[in-house]
Amino acid sequence: MVAELSTTINAAELVRKHRQFFNSGKTQSLEFRLEQLNKLRSLIKANESKIKEALKKDLNKSEFEAYGTEITFVLKDIDHVIASLKKWMKPERVKTPLFHQLGSSWIQSDPLGVVYVIAPWNYPFQLLIAPVIGAMAAGNTVIMKPSRMSANTCQLIDEMISKNFPADYLKVITNFQTTQELLEEKFDYIFFTGGKEVGTEIYQKAAKNLTPVTLELGGKSPCFVDETMNMNWAMKRLIWGKFTNAGQTCVAPDYFLVDNKIKAKFISEAIKTIKEFYGEDPKQSPDFGRIITEKHFQRVSGLFKNAQVIHGGDTDASQKYIAPTILDNVKLDDAVMQEEIFGPLMPIIGYDSLDEAIKIVKSGGKPLALYVYSEDKAYQQYVLNETSSGNGSINECLMHVGQFNLPFGGVGDSGIGQYHGKLSFDIFSHRKGVLKKSTLTDLALRFPPYNSNKVNMLNKLMDWLM
């Protein structure tokens, strides 16, 4: 078991050593940061086959998914950061009002210090390494905790980092006891991806030390479908987004709100596309994943025991396999609608009016993602305007996560904070405002003793100079 890979580490001592390394100033320079990022990139390239193999063992990820959603994603992220870092680190000049005569103003990005990154099991490589890249780029030291559920990927990451980076700079934690003890320590930032329950616990512990956090959570991300939906490419995107990684994606469409006028056609086209992707027996498909653990298999299987299954429904506990499954005539009080599915189930709820569908979404927590499949621009915008979600996509699925020029993150129950692209640098930095003034002269009226003339002059100057 991965929990046995490393002995219990003294959490306080580990954080102390990281803070000592940070305080040495080694992480401050552009040269150091680029050197470490390039080393990490080379390390990932050299271990691509091992990463792919670990993901296959943990989640039965196909080679395409391993590259497309994990390895390539991270490499492109590093490339973007390396190419942009010099610019990001430069002080940002801002306008200085005349009132601050002979002065200049800027914002400089200072590293925060010691960062704690906690990752989930569903994309165990990408969701750990991506925030680590941002923390490294910003000049921090990082203690990182991969999920023990994705045991093979966890072990590989531990080996890659421990053999190539100073433990006081980058450290992987695989021991559960140490993981919990670390949450009692003072960090300069905590970045967590996972479920709401654990995220809430981390938020409470962080608050004791006034530690800022990013919480990437999840929720039930809805998918709106109207009668103008493109049943060709748009349907392919939708089915791919739902069943990639066997549905174990935090931004996967969770349930589908489909106009009753096209519901029958939508279902038939969805079934057709599932068969096109995974064949008559998805269990034999090399492209369809497996549920991560027996516990999660039992949970997801229980969500559709009493549901109306119109396609799929097959399970095999020995392989932790659940077929791509479509559920029709789903009610809001059904088990599948009570929690985030995180599995290959596709509940369909028909609607007669768009406002009726929007009301369903508003009745729950704010989701991490929201999808609209329609060719009607007015419909698209109405849904976006009337709902609140972390992010949104129109006629696309999941792909917004890889658009590094867009912020990614939740709102309300689906999370706190955003990252990706420059935001990954910004969240692990303190944007320090600086005003510099010349000592050649100053406004004499600012200094005591004060009188009515000075007050009147100050008011006039403020109106003119500010």
Residue ranges with predicted function:
Residues 2-5, 28-29, 275, 322-466:
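Conserved C-terminal structural/oligomerization subdomain of aldehyde/semialdehyde dehydrogenase
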Residues 3-5, 165, 198-332, 394, ...:
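ALDH superfamily catalytic-core signature
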Residues 26, 41-44, 48, 59, ...:
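Structural signal for hydrophobic packing residues in well-ordered secondary-structure cores
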Residues 11, 30, 48, 179, ...:
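Residues at or immediately preceding the N-termini of alpha-helices
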Residues 20-26, 117, 223-225, 255-260, ...:
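Short, well-ordered beta-strand elements within core beta-sheets of diverse protein domains
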Residues 1-106:
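N-terminal Rossmann-like NAD(P)+-binding subdomain of aldehyde/semialdehyde dehydrogenases
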Residues 33, 78, 139, 170, ...:
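Residue-level signal for inorganic ion chemistry
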Residues 98-233:
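Rossmann-like NAD(P) dinucleotide-binding subdomain of oxidoreductase/dehydrogenase enzymes
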